[in-house]
From Swiss-Prot:
It comes from Paraburkholderia xenovorans (strain LB400). InterPro entries: Ribosomal_bL19, Ribosomal_bL19_CS, Ribosomal_bL19_sf, Translation_prot_SH3-like_sf. GO terms for molecular function: structural constituent of ribosome. HAMAP family: Ribosomal_bL19. This is Large ribosomal subunit protein bL19. Keywords: Ribonucleoprotein, Ribosomal protein.
Amino acid sequence: MNLIAKLEQEEIARALGEKTIPEFAPGDTVIVSVNVVEGTRKRVQAYEGVVIAKRNRGLNSSFIVRKISSGEGVERTFQTYSPLLASIVVKRRGDVRRAKLYYLRDRSGKSARIKEKLVSKGRAASQA
């Protein structure tokens, strides 16, 4: 492992602390809890939506979450190892055949639905 990769791994470990980031993929519905600072007040804001893209670049990894808010599509990019992220919870797994789901931007209603990934019996037993 070269020096830069080693430093990056140490930085990721330091950024995570005791937090754990669950495995998630494009198509999954996630709830991202974000620490928001407004003046002197700190609060946690939940952002729920579908992961439409994931960018794995070590410390610079990020993912885009899309949701429909008041009939308008809203996308937000999150840095995976940001200290502003309180937690990530996977609500449901989506079954998609693409790595980037940008085509969902052009769709609305039923055509924007994503099938749920069914977990096989063998895999469900190993996860429990």
